[in-house]
């Protein structure tokens, strides 16, 4: 599952590996906040593999990187000694790992529940892939009040804001929000059932 690649990298259009850092799909200001949080992390968990993965792998203070994705071909391009990667088969996908149909809808919840399967407790979780509200709910069960939870595209996507029943906002930068777990009286089973198949 884990293969070695000792250099910083990004991918060329032909699929080759170059020894250059891959930049996350964020603004410069968002990247500054992202880096600040990861500089304080040792065990990092992310929903959605990409430029954020490259940043995490290049942090000497981070000893383990867990990355979940729905695009097998994309995920297989990422290899590093401290990378633990998991592919969730949600069926055929288009850009950004979005399933094109519901042929494997029964597998969709495996994406958000993947965080239940690790033995480590992450100190940073980044939610930037599919099923983001469902991922936020499942993350809540697997972190403590000191864990940093980052969600991208949060500010402009109001359906993500229901997660504020579970988390407090520590800070925001444009579309990136940093959250911390809080006590909640919400019916989490009902909430999860509503969002477990929501690909947004």
Locate the predicted segments by residue.
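Non-catalytic N-terminal targeting/anchoring module and adjacent flexible stem/linker
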Residues: 1-21, 191-200
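Class I SAM-dependent methyltransferase Rossmann-like catalytic core
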Residues: 9-40
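Conserved phosphate-coordination/catalytic loops
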Residues: 21-28, 47, 102-105, 130
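SAM cofactor-binding core of SAM-dependent methyltransferases
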Residues: 28-95
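Local beta-strand N-terminus motif with an aromatic residue
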Residues: 41, 121-123
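S-adenosyl-L-methionine
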Residues: 79-118
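C-terminal substrate-binding/active-site "lid" region of AdoMet-derived donor-dependent transferases
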Residues: 124, 130-200
